[in-house]
């Protein structure tokens, strides 16, 4: 007698949502493959996604944008890639380091190295001040933003950045020269320090082409809840590139 038991079809397993961190790992692996160098650490993501990006990233090599390098991103290192020997490529501004930044969607934010997701104590150490409480640090940041901004700029733009946006498939090689005259801008905050519980964004006041003044958000500061001790600082990168365009050279890959 035949077995009349039927095999039920296996339900489709929903595809896991790709996190921003996963996008970053895939992007770094694609840079490694473009240079033909080992990826520093375990890699458990889609090699097919890596292979889609690698041909465009080979322009880093063929266009002499950044020299031969090694992947140095593990264990919280400051730089994602470090050049072999001194100096950099013709587009590297003489830096021996390269940062890889990514976002899933256009209009995203990028964090500075070292202080972008640090403990408040580390943030204060970099500023040369004593840490007391989050409330006092919020007040200090808002009262001394022209001291804070150069430090954040340095930890973000002191080396070239290769920046990838997944949804638009956009890859840009970004180098900065000098820094803005922060004292020439007027600033406003979305929340003053006494009303700042989670996050507050810094806006600069600029004039548009018609001479009208408007506020543009360039930076977000976030203090996490008690379950997480670190703070987060992120540039609104597309607006930063536009508002301070005179300080950037951008190459589309």
Regions found by a protein language model. Give the residues of each.
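Nucleic-acid endonuclease domains
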Residues: 2-253
